Amino acid sequence: MKVAVVTFDEYVRTRGPALVRLAWLIAGDRHLGEDLVQEVLSRAYPRWKRIVAGGSPDMYLRRMLVNSHVSWRRKRSSTEVADGGDRVESAGDTDLQARSAERDAMWRLINRLPPKQRITIVLRFYEDLDDASIAEILDCSPATVRTHTMRALTTLRVLHPDPAKETLQ
């Protein structure tokens, strides 16, 4: 989404919540997602004019988020064990507890995917980006994006073999 932005403050005010949600989904942890966004925004602020001049601050910051997450994972102590992440809160559907439970179970499965596959799934199905945009963010070819997506969906189908649900297709 290309947004006409005048100032850094205006951008953060309008797009900040979406960046936090994206980081939360990529990292699988709300607090880590918030930390990633703070880090990315603090690094983006001094070069904001150049970022806006590039024409797509959303794409630039998405890539910064992905790169920051990958760097964090590399630096993380090998003794830490992922706990499966926080629940992704539902915006509504209080009457549909089964649907909410299904969504929570799916996010727990997505959090078990390897980082590149999880990032690809989030960018494809949450951010609704095409292969070329995802490839630009991940600095790889569109074919690699399709491979990550296919492997992630295959893994999710194996981990959650419910043929009655066609949410993955």
Question: Where are the regions that the model predicts?
Answer:
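A short, charge-rich alpha-helical start-of-domain segment used by transcription regulators
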Residues: 1-21, 31-34, 45
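Sigma70-family region 2
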Residues: 2, 39-56, 75-77, 159
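Short amphipathic alpha-helical boundary/capping segments
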Residues: 10, 105-113
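Short, small-hydrophobic-rich alpha-helical interface motif
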Residues: 19, 23, 33-44, 61-64, ...
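Arg/Lys-rich amphipathic alpha helix in sigma70-family domain 2
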Residues: 46-53, 63-84, 93, 98-99
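DNA-recognition helix of helix-turn-helix
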Residues: 70, 138-162
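Short helix-coil-helix linker/hinge
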Residues: 100, 110-118
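A short pre-motif secondary-structure segment
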Residues: 120-124
